[in-house]
Regions:
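Register position in tetratricopeptide repeats
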Residues: 1, 35, 69, 101-102, ...
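Structural marker of alpha-solenoid helical repeat scaffolds
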Residues: 18, 52, 69, 85-86, ...
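Start-of-helix register in tetratricopeptide repeats
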Residues: 24, 58, 90-91, 124, ...
Length: 621
């Protein structure tokens, strides 16, 4: 019998090399360790199984017994509770949950929808459908379903927690706070609830208050177990982000280093150090990153983060060839899994040009909300938009906010739920809107952005870069808004994007062909806006700002109808929260050093120059 168990374990070890996220493999491995009477190994694998797929009832049942046997009664009670909950559910729901947990989302959705049709509203079935909606990023459906679940079962804490997560994902921070209140009242010391409360505070721009809260939670986690180290690492990461945003850089570095000390393979923490842009890695840290990058046990997402961090470390050390190789490795890994389809943006651009013509806008003169308060700073990432935001936010009449999602939310509403990338509903849907609907969208934008306007100044900045795709919509619903296109040298911009690992989105930045195609289409679309809305968009070239700061500032303020203020020249002295990767750079005076940084990599950027073409990237004479 023992020989059979050993053979099974050997086979499962081979399977784990290629399928490290397969919950059933961990479950089977845990059962083999139970047969061998190896409780610690069994607990480790069974915990891995239920972490990957919480619907594995057998895993929870076995963990209950193992925890009791080893004297961990608190964990035993939690495992028993999970098992009892699953045992109380109809088998169709449990089956669908298992499928969902193993990534069989289409089958799980079909099964649970059929169950709901036959059995009527069941809170746990509705919750699973909401989870599927969240996974698919159909957040409006997920929100409605969770709202129904917590209305039916107000004390369903797990569903309420997930409901709050969806509200946070939709940037509905006041609503999220209200939904979270019952959880905080029932269990005020619960870390999961307190972390959500901190996330909401961050979303509302209140970074200062979360710093002591993160530190308190870190202090409350004792012991040296794997779980304790992971939790401390996560909290130190979030603490570092808050400190960085508040310009407390030295403390942020300490927090990020504490995260790597708790989890040496924590790619996000290594990248956060690199993403400060001003931090320099020690030889010891570089050695740790190299080791973890090559370790097969390091998760893929951590390897991606570490590759980008190593690229930055080697760049700062002057090893440009090694740096370029590390960046390329990170991009290749990320591109393999991000599912980016270049044709989608290009199709949308063609549709924007077809719909948004001079005649289209002429027929709608006088439409929209005449509120002049928004200042949109848009363009490609890494084009100097954070610098422009900092300059404008240094003015006494202008409030800096963040990259606001509210225009994109309107686009999603116009797009509808049935996405057809070959023939999208948006922007064609703009042709069907009447004057009242257009005005409502303008009012909706102003109302939705109001929670971010903490200082109450007359003007505010929306720095979402991708809004350049929606200049036509912005002009239609907010005809008096200001629109600034942040532009940068194509080679410098594209290479800077290839070096950057974004927290989310910007999937076009992980391949040379992708970023070059995107840049060319961006230029084509901005040329279109200039043609159909002449003078509407102010283009600001980053290199011009560096060469002539005062002249550029006066030009920007004049376009915005704002009087000149010296504070805009001394923008680096402005004390405000800055959330983007350039936060440390805009807290310093302007230097020319960064303009030609890409040229140090020029021997390895021939493919990028070729992809951009001679018009955008001419060879030096």
């Amino acid at each position: 019998m023992m020989q059979q168990t050993d053979a099974a374990l050997a086979a499962l070890e081979r399977l784990a090399v290629h399928h490290s996220r397969f919950s059933q493999m961990y479950l089977e491995r845990g059962l083999c360790h139970v047969a061998r009477r190896d409780a610690p190994a069994a607990i480790f694998d069974l915990r891995s199984a239920v972490t990957l797929n919480p619907a594995l009832a057998m895993g929870w049942r076995m963990l209950d017994g193992l925890y009791r046997m080893t004297g961990d009664l608190r964990s035993a009670e939690l495992a028993a509770g999970h098992f009892a909950h699953l045992a109380s559910l109809p088998p169709q729901i449990v089956h669908a949950k298992v499928l969902f947990g193993d990534g069989e989302i289409d089958v799980a959705e079909e099964l649970i929808r059929r169950f709901l049709l036959e059995a009527g509203n069941h809170p746990e079935a509705m919750r699973l459908l909401a989870q599927i909606g969240h996974q698919r990023n159909v957040l409006d459906d997920a929100e409605a379903l969770y709202e129904g679940v917590v209305a039916m079962v107000p004390d369903h804490d797990a569903a309420r927690h997930e409901y709050v997560q969806v509200l946070i994902a939709r940037h509905k921070f006041p609503q999220a706070r209200a939904a979270l209140e019952p959880l905080l009242k029932r269990d005020p010391r619960n870390h999961a609830h307190r972390i959500q409360a901190a996330t909401i505070s961050v979303g509302l721009g209140n970074f200062e208050s979360v710093i002591p809260e993160y530190r308190a939670m870190i202090a409350e986690i004792g012991g040296d177990t794997h779980d304790a180290r992971v939790r401390r690492a996560d909290l130190n990461l979030w603490l570092g982000h808050a400190l960085k945003t508040e310009a407390r850089t030295a403390e942020a570095i300490d927090a990020y280093m504490a995260a790597t000390a708790n989890r040496p393979d924590f790619g996000d923490a290594w990248w956060s150090l690199a993403n400060l842009k001003t931090y320099r890695f020690s030889a010891e840290s570089i050695a740790v990153m190299r080791e973890r990058l090559e370790d097969p046990a390091t998760a893929e997402t951590d390897r991606i983060h570490i590759a980008f961090a190593l690229g930055k470390a080697l760049e700062d050390a002057g090893d440009y060839e090694g740096s370029c190789a590390a960046y390329s490795r990170g991009n290749t890994m990320h591109r393999a899994s991000n599912g980016y389809v270049p044709d989608v943006f290009e199709t949308n651009t063609r549709e924007q040009k077809r719909v948004c013509t001079p005649e289209f806008f002429a027929k709608r003169t006088g439409w929209g909300l005449d509120d002049p308060s928004p200042i949109f700073v848009l363009g490609l990432p890494r084009s100097g938009s954070t610098l422009l935001e900092q300059i404008l936010a240094s003015h006494s009449m202008v409030e800096g906010t963040q990259e606001l999602p509210d225009i994109q939310r309107i686009v999603h509403e116009l797009q509808g739920r049935e996405l057809n990338f070959d023939k999208p509903l948006y922007p064609g849907a703009l042709e069907d809107l009447d004057a009242a609907a257009v005005r409502r969208y303008g009012e909706q934008y102003i109302a939705d952005t109001m929670p971010n306007r903490i200082l109450g100044r007359p003007f505010f900045i929306d720095k979402m870069p991708n809004n350049f795709r929606h200049v036509g919509l912005i002009h239609l619903i907010l005809p008096n808004a200001k629109i600034i296109d942040a532009r940068r040298d194509p080679m410098a911009c594209c290479f800077s994007n290839l070096k950057q690992l974004f927290a989310q989105g910007q999937e076009f930045t992980y391949g040379i062909e992708d970023i070059a195609r995107y840049y060319k289409t961006y230029v084509e679309l901005m040329d279109h806006w200039d043609a159909v809305l002449p003078g509407r968009v102010l283009r600001v070239q980053h290199e011009d700002v560096v060469d002539d700061l005062e002249g550029s500032v006066r030009r920007i303020l004049d376009y915005c109808g704002l009087p000149f203020e010296d504070a805009c020249i001394e923008f680096h002295k402005t004390k405000r929260s800055v959330r983007t990767p350039s936060s440390e750079q805009v807290r310093q005076p302007i230097f020319r050093d960064g303009l030609d940084q890409w040229k140090k990599f020029e021997p390895w950027l021939g493919a990028l120059r070729e992809a951009l073409g001679p018009e955008l990237a001419p060879r030096a004479a």
